[in-house]
């Protein structure tokens, strides 16, 4: 007894479910067959449409050639006949009418453009008017344009004659201002009267080659300020005297001979007097021979430094009113520099005035007087770190601190160009008598911080993670032409870009546009070779992706095909692996691998298998960038579902196990090649390379590979996981291109870059965009505020 009943010899009676499952599978198989047939019909329909488009293109080419021939024959007939027959002239009338209509249409278009331009000009005019009204209603604009200072009277428009008349009517002696440098100093009326009563001797000191006249020239004033600064440098650091009253005031009445000028004899004589006494006390330690004793100078300097400044300084105004409301006459002074030192200072009245090594008329160097009897203490030196130190901190306890902003000082860097630097709110000790002391006195903290920041910026490497640039031409459907390539292109036979089993690639140039292209010359021997080239052209006609090379034109001859393609000059990716001057990091490999996966993903979306992916078939866009393009679609095949495709070609070390075993190929076949390329980029080694091709294929069939301990030391586990999930013998277990792009290793590039002390270019562009957006936002806010300011404000 076998244990099986006679009624059911096969033992299948109680098993009803398997039979039902078989019926379901049969139904599913039928549906799959129907779906396969539909897909095949769609593919055939697509091929038919492509062939018809090619026929249409060829017909258009033939029609264009016929039109050219017809035009040539018509031109020959016109040249042969001496005069145009009436019928030809009548036939040309409609063309003339069409040209006239076209001219009228263009005229109407130009009129519309002119009208739009006129509207734009009107809008700009309104905007300018709005800006002008806003600027006029602004107090800052009044301060800049008219020279008015809050709490003062007068402006730049006031003339010297009017101010002098106002001063005479008021009957009060005004405080005078040296207008050459915009410097103002307040002095008490007691000092002014004492100086008027005294008989000031005339002194002469050699060393200041200046002649002061009473004509107004702005350029000469700046030269005078620079020359007087040279006189200050002779005294040495820390020994510049304080400005006394005589330095900051001018004679009251104008000269009778020239009604618009004032003598400077008293002020310059006081300068020469003070500095001569200082020089004599330094040279021989003798007693100074000034018209007033040291105690008077100390008292006078103390009054000047501690006297209250009733009004803040305004811009460089040649005439400003005193606090009592009286007008101050403008003093036009012309300073002319002489080449020979030792000349005398002369006024227009002809009396020689002793020159002195003093601060320039356009510059007043200040200092504080501590308690004690020394009239001229040295200038305290400070660095830029204590730029906020006020004058009250440096003045002695016995003296009253100076109130109001300090006087304007002239920066030594601007003396050569004659500009004036207003340094309001800076203590007088900040003025360095020697020009070279400014930068030398800066604190080391800022310098060290600048060095550290510059070193940190230099250490950060910027990686360009942007997408590959598109082809310099629009995507086109190319039809193979049977004309000569030399008619439209110039092929450089001596400049070979690459080569392989198919032939060679030369650089070429389009004659009409000068566009640089690449010419791939493929040798054909039989009908099968021609079909393969046509298949390559058909596949490239369907590809339009930045990581895939683009086809531009195609030509056919008796023994070869020439494909005109996009040109890139970065070289093969294989060179990046083998060349010692290129040091690939893991982040570089991430950028390369991601673009390879994007190109393969596009191919697989269009049911195309590349089947020959390797570093030699991947070109870099530039010598140092990270943008790539996949080339060589000669072995590419269209993948058709339910159609068992087998291939027996390819480079041995990049072949998938199913290709070596001559099994069916599909999308995972390309992903195996992607895994091999990634392994090579990470380590520089080939995972399956043997001494012979047979040994290499044996390693591939057995999937015999591992991570080299030395080369993969220090690489992330994510990179190893990425390679391990691609180099799998079973096709269904490999990652697809979509899964590769979603893998952790190819994601989160900014975080990986920050961990590697690398900055991505996309991050820089984003930061720049955010900064520009923020700037625009602030600009709009300021614009809105300025528009609101056009409304009248309360007085």
Swiss-Prot record:
Localization annotation: Cytoplasm
Tissue: Restricted to cardiomyocytes (at protein level). Down-regulated in heart after experimental myocardial infarction at the protein level; no significant changes at the mRNA level.
UniProt entry keywords in alphabetical sequence: ATP-binding, Cytoplasm, Kinase, Magnesium, Nucleotide-binding, Phosphoprotein, Serine/threonine-protein kinase, Transferase
GO cellular component: cytoplasm; cytosol
Cell inner membrane is among the record's keywords: no
Active-site residues per Swiss-Prot or TrEMBL entry: 612
Name this polypeptide is given: Myosin light chain kinase 3
